[in-house]
């Protein structure tokens, strides 16, 4: 019986209700207080008028005598503690008691000089009179009125999140500074016209120390042309590499937009339970003729890994093939068996009875995420030991993600995007988001980090990838001009030049002198602009491969091979990891891959090169293969749509997006290797196809496809165009076409 009572009282919801009932009872006791009721100071035979009875009469008299009106702080504290218990926000009992005592003593001291008929002593009670008389011996009464309100403010600060206060003060200071500067910038030039406030030509108002962007970059203000023929005060900050307008000062989103981690940490299995499960596992292995011993147990938030050392002569493939039989024998959802790199053991992973869920905020607040050596942090989740796993996209340098519907793939991609949004401003990192499904990435449409609105048409997706290739080539030319090898060196050199107030110039040969034959050089000034990282996110690769497979594969290959040093990285996802979507060329250029739960062993081998993904549990459970080809199991964090909506709304309010129209606009030139997917025909390519048909006397789609090295859809469009122009006939009953052009 006591066990069940203890179990009920340990529930946070039950504790909250009990605290609320106690607080309400104290309020009723204090509100129904009557000085004529029986108490410690008076004796009467009449029944007490207090609503709680004789207990309420004595309790109210005690509280009013000692604490006065400040007794209402006690039920207020009960209500606040009950709310915290309800939401699982536990704090130290010492801190809670200290806060209440500090509030009672400070408030009682402030009210000690007020006399009331209801309370014989004072409005602050006996405690207030004692503390006030003691302090007046050493401190002036005026200072006393300043010290104890400070204690009350300290109480309020202890009960409120410091992050909320700091964010409010930052926003308030930004707002006031901005409008004060606008006021002086508008009023002072007009006062100088009438001689009230003369301004010299070289007067400048330096606000560097008053207003700076709360991120790693600096902001340069651009001034509008004034209509007043006077010398206005110039409002400036030392120019750096990126420029944004004065009403679009971008900042990182506050951490308070993310949901707080709930206190739902599941109590793990005890050591005795783990040993018992290990013995059961050994028994099952012995039943199948596998001998060995378990040397270590690693309990994680979702699964528990048993390190099994097989006997000498036991093949690994034999143990791995028993995964389904072990899961059936132990009544487990699934079992994954894999070799642990660097150890002479096999890791047998069994799911826990209760799964631990954790949110993204818990991982963003870790030291691993704050590590500045990680240039492009991607929050992946927690490993088998429960430690945060933060990957660096700059070192990957590209990521391939696969998983079926409901496996947590979309939530994982959202966590990666949000982790980048919390690290970089729009001047430091930009995105190209391609979402043919028009569902997953549409929530980010309109944020200032985008180079173009979310691309949903496959034809524009090819153009966007083509633009990324051109941007990569342009960046390589810029880096070679100043003699650096990567984007980090380029930005460092630009920042160094800006700090020294100099420009970077480079002589370029433009020709030769016709008289002397010596080379002619011209000095070219480099554009002093910092290059941001560009992350290309493709949510569904299968749809793009269906429309223009060859062209997409070629562009992805070029970016994956060369774009790392230029600061362009790709995150590509698909829910159909088949060989026609994830081709050998793509796999060779994406060493870093993530596989969520898939349907079959074949899909697991396609994405990772080995089986195991089909044994995952779903809901964020994944296998991560870094660029070292080492596979580790990771459990992803949860980020809901409400959090994403808050973050995107904040970013939209702080800054407007600056789109580059060329990202999705078809260039005027004709490129024979571009299939825009809408049935249009390139005239140059069409003439080549007609020439091939005339010379070779072959008109099949596959032959034209091989000859021109284009996609099947484009070759079919060319043949249909020839049929309309009367070059070839329509296909007969066997599918062959007759060539109507005469031989050359």
Curated annotation (Swiss-Prot):
Pfam families: FtsK_4TM, FtsK_alpha, FtsK_gamma, FtsK_SpoIIIE
GO biological process, one term: cell division
Annotated keywords: ATP-binding, Cell cycle, Cell division, Cell inner membrane, Cell membrane, Chromosome partition, DNA-binding, Membrane, Nucleotide-binding, Transmembrane, Transmembrane helix
The organism's taxonomic lineage, starting at the top: Bacteria, Pseudomonadati, Pseudomonadota, Alphaproteobacteria, Rickettsiales
The family this protein is said to belong to: Belongs to the FtsK/SpoIIIE/SftA family.
A molecular function GO annotation: ATP hydrolysis activity
Subunit and partners: Homohexamer. Forms a ring that surrounds DNA.
Task of the protein: Essential cell division protein that coordinates cell division and chromosome segregation. The N-terminus is involved in assembly of the cell-division machinery. The C-terminus functions as a DNA motor that moves dsDNA in an ATP-dependent manner towards the dif recombination site, which is located within the replication terminus region. Translocation stops specifically at Xer-dif sites, where FtsK interacts with the Xer recombinase, allowing activation of chromosome unlinking by recombination. FtsK orienting polar sequences (KOPS) guide the direction of DNA translocation.
Transmembrane residue ranges: 15-35, 62-82, 92-112, 114-134, 138-158, 179-199
Stored PROSITE patterns: FTSK
UniProt main location, coarse: membrane
Residues binding ATP, per UniProt: 406-411
Cysteine pairs bridged by disulfides in the record: none
Species: Rickettsia prowazekii (strain Madrid E)
Domain of life of the organism encoding this protein: Bacteria
One CC-aspect GO term: plasma membrane
Domain notes: Consists of an N-terminal domain, which is sufficient for the localization to the septal ring and is required for cell division, followed by a linker domain, and a C-terminal domain, which forms the translocation motor involved in chromosome segregation. The C-terminal domain can be further subdivided into alpha, beta and gamma subdomains. The alpha and beta subdomains multimerise to produce a hexameric ring, contain the nucleotide binding motif and form the DNA pump.
Boundaries of every FtsK domain copy: 386-605
Localization in the cell: Cell inner membrane
Protein name, per record: DNA translocase FtsK
Cytoplasmic side: 200-744
Topology versus the membrane: Multi-pass membrane protein
């Amino acid at each position: 019986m006591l066990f069940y009572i203890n179990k009920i009282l340990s529930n946070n919801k039950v504790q909250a209700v009990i605290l609320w009932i106690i607080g309400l009872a104290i309020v009723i006791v204090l509100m129904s207080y009557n000085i004529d009721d029986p108490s410690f100071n008076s004796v009467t035979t009449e029944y007490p008028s207090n609503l709680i009875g004789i207990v309420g009469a004595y309790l109210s008299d005690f509280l009013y005598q000692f604490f006065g009106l400040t007794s209402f702080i006690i039920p207020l504290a009960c209500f606040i503690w009950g709310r915290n218990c309800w939401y699982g926000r536990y704090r130290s009992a010492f801190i809670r008691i200290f806060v209440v005592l500090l509030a009672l003593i400070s408030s009682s001291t402030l009210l000690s000089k007020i006399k009331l008929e209801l309370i014989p002593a004072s409005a602050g009670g006996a405690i207030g009179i004692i503390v006030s008389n003691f302090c007046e011996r050493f401190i002036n009464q005026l200072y006393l009125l300043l010290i104890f309100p400070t204690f009350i403010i300290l109480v309020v600060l202890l009960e409120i999140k410091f992050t909320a206060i700091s964010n409010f003060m930052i926003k308030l200071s930004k707002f006031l500074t901005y409008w004060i500067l606008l006021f002086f910038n508008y009023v002072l030039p007009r006062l100088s016209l009438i001689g009230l406030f003369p301004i010299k030509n070289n007067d400048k108002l330096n606000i560097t120390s008053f207003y700076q962007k709360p991120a790693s970059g600096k902001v340069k203000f651009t001034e509008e042309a004034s209509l007043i023929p006077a010398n206005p005060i110039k409002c400036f900050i030392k120019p750096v590499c990126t420029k944004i307008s004065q009403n679009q000062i971008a900042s990182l989103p506050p951490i308070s937009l993310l949901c707080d981690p709930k206190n739902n940490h599941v109590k793990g299995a005890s050591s005795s339970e783990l040993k018992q499960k290990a013995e059961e596992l050994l028994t099952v292995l012995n039943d199948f003729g596998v001998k060995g011993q378990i040397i270590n147990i690693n309990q994680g938030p979702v699964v528990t890994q048993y390190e099994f050392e097989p006997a000498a002569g036991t093949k690994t493939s034999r143990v791995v093939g028993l995964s389904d039989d072990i899961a059936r024998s132990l009544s487990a959802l699934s079992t994954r068996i894999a070799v642990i790199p660097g150890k002479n053991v096999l890791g047998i992973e069994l799911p826990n009875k209760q799964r631990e869920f954790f949110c993204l905020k818990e991982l963003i607040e870790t030291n691993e995420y704050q590590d500045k050596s990680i240039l492009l942090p991607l929050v992946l989740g927690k490993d088998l030991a429960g430690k945060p796993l933060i990957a660096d996209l700059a070192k990957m340098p590209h990521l391939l993600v696969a998983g079926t519907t409901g496996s947590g793939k979309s939530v994982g991609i959202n966590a990666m995007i949000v982790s980048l949004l919390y690290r970089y401003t729009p001047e430091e990192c930009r995105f190209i988001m391609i979402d043919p499904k028009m569902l997953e990435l549409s929530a980010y449409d309109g944020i200032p980090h985008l180079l173009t609105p979310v691309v949903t048409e496959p034809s524009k997706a090819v153009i966007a990838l083509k633009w990324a290739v051109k941007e990569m080539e342009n960046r390589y030319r810029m880096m070679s001009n100043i003699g650096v090898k990567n984007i980090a060196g380029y930005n460092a050199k630009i920042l160094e030049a800006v700090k020294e107030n100099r420009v970077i110039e480079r002589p370029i040969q433009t020709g030769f002198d016709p008289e002397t034959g010596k080379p002619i050089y011209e000095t070219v000034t480099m554009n002093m602009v910092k290059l941001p990282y560009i992350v290309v996110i493709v949510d569904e690769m299968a749809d793009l491969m269906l429309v223009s497979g060859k062209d997409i594969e070629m562009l992805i290959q070029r970016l994956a091979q060369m774009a790392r040093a230029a600061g362009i990285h790709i995150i590509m996802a698909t829910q159909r990891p088949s060989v026609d979507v994830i081709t050998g060329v793509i796999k060779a250029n994406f060493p870093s891959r993530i596989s969520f739960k898939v349907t079959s062993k074949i899909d697991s081998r396609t994405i990772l090169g080995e089986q195991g993904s089909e044994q995952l549990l779903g809901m964020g459970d994944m296998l991560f293969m870094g660029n070292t080809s080492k596979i580790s199991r990771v459990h992803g964090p949860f980020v809901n749509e409400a959090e994403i909506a808050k973050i995107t709304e904040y970013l939209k309010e702080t800054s407007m997006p600056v789109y580059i129209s060329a990202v999705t606009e078809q260039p005027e030139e004709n490129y024979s290797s571009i299939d825009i997917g809408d049935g249009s025909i390139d005239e140059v390519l069409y003439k080549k196809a007609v020439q091939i048909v005339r010379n070779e006397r072959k008109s099949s789609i596959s032959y034209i496809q091989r000859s021109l090295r284009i996609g099947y859809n484009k070759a079919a469009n060319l043949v249909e165009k020839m049929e309309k122009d009367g070059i070839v006939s329509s296909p007969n009953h066997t599918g062959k076409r007759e060539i109507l052009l005469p031989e050359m």
